[in-house]
């Protein structure tokens, strides 16, 4: 449904607000409410306020949301919805104070104020208030402007301002640095989430502005698909005065999920001209789906419930998968594209190269887990399956040429799967001949406790030799890579599994891949990719990350993957122990500190620039990169699966122009270039 104001007379007032619980435990245990006090938890504050604004749009009462990161680090979220009620509540305080100071107080419990919502689960704007040093709320409703502030959650006195015919809510908050490890918001993280929300709410305009840009930074004003978006007074003023020193993006997608699928497939080659899109409604349920196959080998299916990104899927995805597998097999047999004696195509065969977005709206959602990553409503599966069966069957019958292309791709995938199974069996037989069923070149650790064991995947034989000699063999295993690992983004699974290095990695980890993946069989809970600090080493690391993301994604999702950070420089002092620097800035700092202390650098070889791991002996490698007491490891996390999928497609896929554009666009962010 396009974002249009709903002028229905539904009353939204003090009686709509129900209190469930107070705020006592929030500051004491913030992780219980926002997941963590790190960067992810910090951004969760924005999501909570934005979710409330988007709920107004979903209910038909708002058409735009404006998000601004101020120069002082505070965040402002403004919508043109109905405005938070300000009249006196039954508790004896202004209703806005109830909303801001009582946990789980809101208008989402009666089933009428909001038919569906995404901003309720676990927290709400009251938790944002609890975790902020200050929060300011400006409300436009009942013909007036209202202002309220909260100093460490304690409300001031509600003030009535001038008259206005507009409606809406503006929330501005300052995250508490005593609670959070950082209060520095990531612009791209915020932009991706807001773009996602705009895709999911057809016609809604979401504008993001970042005022923290320094004078030296280039203006980054990216506006896409906004032809139908109404311009604000600020936008008109900006056009008149020219660009300002801010980052600014506007998201507006009249096509909704169709535009989302176009976005996912924009760096890939679609094998069908049209994008399949359909929707359906039932008592308390709605579903909307858009999908299109591409020539690639990876599945890219993204699911949402009440605009919440359900990373772990759930019953809506199960219903979609079951219907898709059934419809394609039935169509293939009916049209003789599969012989009667041929085995059915599997779901994996059919979903190869599929880009799809599934969005459901559920009146009484049941989310599994505190962070709402899996939908648990059992009735949703049958509802989605029924709609998909009807709509997909109709599309296949109405588009025989494109349907045949889709089926042929699935048949080709099945043939590759059979070849891959033979390759896997070959890997198993080969590994069985090695000692303990493990790769012969693996130097295993003595510990048999996976939670205490580490696997270093090391580029090159020489570095592998140094790592074997320098490691702590009690808990550190070493797997050297002798040859070049295959780019899995450009190869089908049967070719991938014939690659010797891939075979070694899969066998060493023990989990299997794809549908055979079993994380309980993981032999090392910390997998460290250790490559040279130059361009070639970074390429090797990217190839390995692509393999892990495409074939063993739960390892990334569960935080088992790390990148080693070997030093770039060795500083040799006269009559003093050498020091190691991991960046140009650290090198300069060590030089300045050393000289200030009266130390002198060696004349001939005082500053050694490492070109590769092989230049370090075993002792140096241990002291700088492998010793748990001093090493630096960067954990690989997966906050946005769609963004990660897109990035791997751009960097490792076939589209050269997309890769060139990405590099050009991000060149200004490169600080160190090894040439």
Swiss-Prot record:
Any one GO BP annotation for this protein: DNA-templated DNA replication
Q: Where is the Toprim domain?
A: 453-567
SMART domains to which the protein is assigned, alphabetical: HATPase_c, TOP2c
Q: Reaction catalysed by this chain?
A: ATP-dependent breakage, passage and rejoining of double-stranded DNA
Q: Which positions are annotated as binding Mg(2+) 2? A: 532, 534
Q: Which SUPFAM superfamilies match?
A: ATPase domain of HSP90 chaperone/DNA topoisomerase II/histidine kinase (SSF55874), Ribosomal protein S5 domain 2-like (SSF54211), Type II DNA topoisomerase (SSF56719)
What Pfam families does the entry give? DNA_gyraseB, DNA_gyraseB_C, HATPase_c, Toprim
A single cellular component GO annotation: chromosome
Main enzyme class = isomerase
Organism superkingdom = Bacteria
Gene Ontology molecular functions: ATP binding; DNA binding; DNA negative supercoiling activity; metal ion binding
Which additional comment does the entry carry? Few gyrases are as efficient as E.coli at forming negative supercoils. Not all organisms have 2 type II topoisomerases; in organisms with a single type II topoisomerase this enzyme also has to decatenate newly replicated chromosomes.
Q: What is this protein called?
A: DNA gyrase subunit B
């Amino acid at each position: 449904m396009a974002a249009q104001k709903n002028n229905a007379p539904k009353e939204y007032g003090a009686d709509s607000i129900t209190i469930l619980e107070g705020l006592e435990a929030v500051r004491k245990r913030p992780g219980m409410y926002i997941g963590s006090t790190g960067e992810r938890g910090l951004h969760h504050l924005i999501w909570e306020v934005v979710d409330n604004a988007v709920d107004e749009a979903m209910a038909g009462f708002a058409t735009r949301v404006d998000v601004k990161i101020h120069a002082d680090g505070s965040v402002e979220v403004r919508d043109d919805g109905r405005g938070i009620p300000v009249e006196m509540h039954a508790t004896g305080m202004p209703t806005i104070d109830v909303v801001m100071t009582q946990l789980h107080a809101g208008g989402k419990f009666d089933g009428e104020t909001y038919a569906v919502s995404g901003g309720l689960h676990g927290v709400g704007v009251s938790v944002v208030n609890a975790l902020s040093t200050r929060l300011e709320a400006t409300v436009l409703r009942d013909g007036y402007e209202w202002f309220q502030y909260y100093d460490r959650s304690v409300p001031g006195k509600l003030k009535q301002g001038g008259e206005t015919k507009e409606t809406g809510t503006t929330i501005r908050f300052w995250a508490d640095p005593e609670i959070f490890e950082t209060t520095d918001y990531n612009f791209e993280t915020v932009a991706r989430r807001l773009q996602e929300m705009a895709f999911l709410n057809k016609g809604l305009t979401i504008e993001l502005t970042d005022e923290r840009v320094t004078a030296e930074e280039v203006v980054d004003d990216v506006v896409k698909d906004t032809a139908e978006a109404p311009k604000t007074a600020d936008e008109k003023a900006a056009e008149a005065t020219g660009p300002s020193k801010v980052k600014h993006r506007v998201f507006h997608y009249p096509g909704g999920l169709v535009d989302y699928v176009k976005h996912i497939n924009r760096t890939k080659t679609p094998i069908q001209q049209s994008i399949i899109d359909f929707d359906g409604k039932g008592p308390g349920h709605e579903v909307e789906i858009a999908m299109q196959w591409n020539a690639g080998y990876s599945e890219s299916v993204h699911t949402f419930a009440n605009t919440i990104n359900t990373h772990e899927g759930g019953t809506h995805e199960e219903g979609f998968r079951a219907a898709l597998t059934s419809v394609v097999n039935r169509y293939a047999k009916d049209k003789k594209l599969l012989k009667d004696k041929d085995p059915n195509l599997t779901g994996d065969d059919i979903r190869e190269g599929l880009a799809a977005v599934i969005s459901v709206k559920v009146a009484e959602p049941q989310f599994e887990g505190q962070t709402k990553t899996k939908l648990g409503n059992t009735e949703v599966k049958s509802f989605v399956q029924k709609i998909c069966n009807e709509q997909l069957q109709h599309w296949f019958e109405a588009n025989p040429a494109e349907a045949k292309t889709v089926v042929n791709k699935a048949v080709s995938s099945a043939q590759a799967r059979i070849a891959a199974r033979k390759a896997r069996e070959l890997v198993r037989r080969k590994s069985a001949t090695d000692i303990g069923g493990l790769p012969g070149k693996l130097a295993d650790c003595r510990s048999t406790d996976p939670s205490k064991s580490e696997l270093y995947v090391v580029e090159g034989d020489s570095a592998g030799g140094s790592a074997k000699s320098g490691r702590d063999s009690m808990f550190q295993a070493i797997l050297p890579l002798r040859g070049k690992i295959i780019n899995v983004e450009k190869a089908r699974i049967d070719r991938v599994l014939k690659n010797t290095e891939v075979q070694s990695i899969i066998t060493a980890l023990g989990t299997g891949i794809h549908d055979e993946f079993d994380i309980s069989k993981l032999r090392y809970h910390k997998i460290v990719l250790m490559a040279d600090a130059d361009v070639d080493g970074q390429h090797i690391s990217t190839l390995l990350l692509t393999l892990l993301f495409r074939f063993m994604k739960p390892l990334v999702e569960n935080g088992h993957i790390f990148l080693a950070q070997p030093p770039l420089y060795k500083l040799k002092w006269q009559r003093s122990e050498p020091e190691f620097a991991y960046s140009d800035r650290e090198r300069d700092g060590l030089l300045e500190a050393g000289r200030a202390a009266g130390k002198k650098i060696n004349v001939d070889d005082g500053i050694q620039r490492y070109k590769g791991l092989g230049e370090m002996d075993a002792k140096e490698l241990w002291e700088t990169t492998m010793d748990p007491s001093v090493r630096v490891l960067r954990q690989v996390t997966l906050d946005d699966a769609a963004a990660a999928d897109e990035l791997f497609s751009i960097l490792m896929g076939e589209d050269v122009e997309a890769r060139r554009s990405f590099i050009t666009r991000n060149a200004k962010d490169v600080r160190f270039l090894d040439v």
